[in-house]
Each structure stands twice: as C-alpha cells, then as structure tokens.
C-alpha cells in the first residue's frame, strides 16, 4: 500500500501540471493580461516584492472573507490574477526602463486600453491603463507601470470587474476617486 501511494503521488502531481498550465494560458489570453517580462528582464535583478495571486488562491480568499465583507468578496471573486513586482535598486537604468515602458504603453494604446494616468516629471515615469469592455461596463484589466530612480513597480490586475464593483469598494473604504469613477 505504501508503495502504491509513493507511485501515485508523483503521477497525480504530474497530471496536475497540464491543468495549471492551461489556467495560466487562459489568463494570458484574457484581454486584461499584460506581459511585463521585457521590463523584468531589463531590470536584471530579482524583484524585492513579488506578489502573484491566481484564481485558486483568490477563490479561497473570497470564501474566507465572504461572511465578513460581502462587497470585497464579490470584487475579489471577479479577479483572475493579481501580479505585483517591485524592484528597488539604484542600479536600474530608469531611462532604459522608461523607454521600454513607452513601447508597452504604445502597444496597450493600439490594443484598445484606456490610459487614465500619465506622468512624465523629472525622472518619474507613470502610466495607468484600464482595459474596458466595448460598452465600458466591465474592466478586464488594470495595468500600472512606475519607474523612478531606485524604484520600478509593475502591477497587472486581470478579471471581469464592473465599474459598480469598484464604486462599491470605494464607498466601503472611503476612496472618493473610486466612488466617482467614470470610465466612459
């Protein structure tokens, strides 16, 4: 019996790999997904902070908080992936990162993303984009790119989030900018 368990466990684990890879491919094909790999390659260092929340973990969080905060649980349940990478290093070439961020920003513009924030001040470079459905009732993704001397931050939130969900979240946490969000 022990031998059977020893043989089955690796086989089950190997069998789960295609399922996990298929889930990753679904997220990569989602209109709200942004591939920041070129920027992480340019940084040439490991991120100081790396957050990668995928659907299974997000579903678990949703179930854990549903009884305490229904609005937050509803919001989280619509997310497919949240990725945050923070690089803190004076060795990062801000001009090179900013140039690559401009290329990604141009790509996002061509793909139909809406730029909601653009800052070019001194050596600070910030872009925030929303990927909206055709009727602008659903936000498929949020992309945030920040580069300044010593810090680079990349965020991608992928899901099917209604503007009403964001407004409710803004009310819940007293964030007026989210309550009054108008993406039309």
Label every PLM stretch briefly.
Residues 1-9:
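Bacterial N-terminal signal peptides that target proteins for export
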Residues 18-26:
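Sec/Tat signal peptide C-region and signal peptidase I cleavage site
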């Amino acid at each position: 019996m022990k031998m059977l368990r020893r043989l089955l466990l690796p086989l089950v684990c190997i069998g789960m790999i295609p399922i996990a890879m298929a889930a990753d491919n679904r997220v990569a094909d989602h209109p709200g997904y942004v591939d920041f790999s070129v920027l992480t390659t340019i940084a040439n260092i490991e991120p100081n902070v790396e957050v990668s929340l995928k659907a299974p973990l997000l579903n678990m969080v949703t179930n854990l908080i549903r009884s305490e905060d229904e609005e937050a649980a509803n919001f989280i349940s619509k997310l497919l992936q949240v990725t945050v990478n923070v690089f803190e290093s004076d060795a990062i070439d801000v001009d090179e990162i900013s140039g690559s961020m401009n290329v990604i920003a141009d790509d996002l513009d061509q793909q139909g993303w809406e730029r909601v924030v653009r800052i070019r001040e001194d050596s600070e470079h910030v872009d925030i984009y929303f990927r909206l459905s055709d009727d602008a009732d659903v936000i498929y993704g949020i992309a945030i790119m920040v580069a300044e001397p010593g810090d680079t931050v990349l965020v991608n939130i992928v899901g099917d989030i209604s503007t009403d969900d964001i407004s409710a979240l803004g009310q819940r946490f007293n964030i007026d900018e989210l309550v009054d969000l108008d993406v039309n």
